[in-house]
Amino acid sequence: MRRAPEDTNGTSTTAGRLVARVAAVIAMTGLAALMTAGPAVAQAGALAALGSPPDPKVPVSWDRYYDHAAVEDIGRRLEEAYPDRCRFGSIGKSYEGRDIWLLTVTNFRVGEADRKPAMYIDGNIHSNEIQGQEIALYTAWYLCEMADRVPWVSDLLDDRTMYIVPTINPDGRAAFIDSPNTPSSPRSGVAPRDDDGDGLFDEDDLDDLNGDGHITMMRRRDPNGRWLVSREDPRLMIRARPDEPGEYEILGYEGFDNDNDGRVNEDRTGYYDPNRNWPWLWQPQYVQSGADAYPTSLPETRAVIDFVVNHENIAGAQTYHNSGGMILRGPG
């Protein structure tokens, strides 16, 4: 989240107040805990609800991850159910031609969306960090469903606009969900790149050798190896203590030397990092791995920048990653 600027008196500006208000939405809806929605709980004052509505107009199961078509379906159903509260559209196209979906949530009966102070929210820029999409999508759904039930949510949408992009990286997300993968790959998008400089593109990717739908580590028995099989789960390996013999060596992830260059899995899908492709403090590939050829070389980052630049009412932003367990605020 970019930190809100302060005025000359040291008090938060509109951006700061907006960020604080949206933080309340995040806290109240349980988004920080991956949307573990509970029953409605009466609370004093403005904090009047916790969890999800018992009878939503747009029923959505939040115990699963959704593909591109399902996100479109949810977005269009929200727009149909709440025509004065939600607009569903796209900010651009991905490399493979998928729409980068946008939900604009506000009270359209009270002022124009683009003339209210706005919060921009996105997620899932890294294709393996898929939870970000559902958190962003849940935010839009929760605001639409709860505005008629909770006064402070209604007030928020009267005065503010939420621009919500569930995933910046729909191609990478689809590849991560639909194809065999490791927990950390693919992390980028899917535009071909020549990672090993041999003139070929993505020719030595991971290979699902046993056809189980997963890319896992390979092991081989070796009396000089330093790994043991876990007694609790035979799929797990435990490093042997210095005073005990090992039984296996780890060979790396499943794969062949597809291009016969003596290396395995060295030119995978991508690789670039969309989150290193922004103009701010951009560095070339040899300094910052994944930066790609130049800032905004990727259609996905270009679409986000164009949208933000063309919406001067955006006063704060939140982008969802996973695994860090922290909220990072930029300087300023």
Question: What label would you give each PLM region?
Answer:
Residues 1-20:
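N-terminal secretory signal peptides that target proteins for export/translocation
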Residues 4-5, 38, 42:
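Intrinsically disordered, low-complexity regions enriched in polar/acidic and amide residues
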Residues 9-15, 30, 37, 183:
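N-terminal compositionally biased, intrinsically disordered segments and leader/signal-like regions
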Residues 17, 30-34, 46-49:
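Acidic/proline-rich low-complexity IDRs
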Residues 22-36:
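Bacterial N-terminal signal peptides
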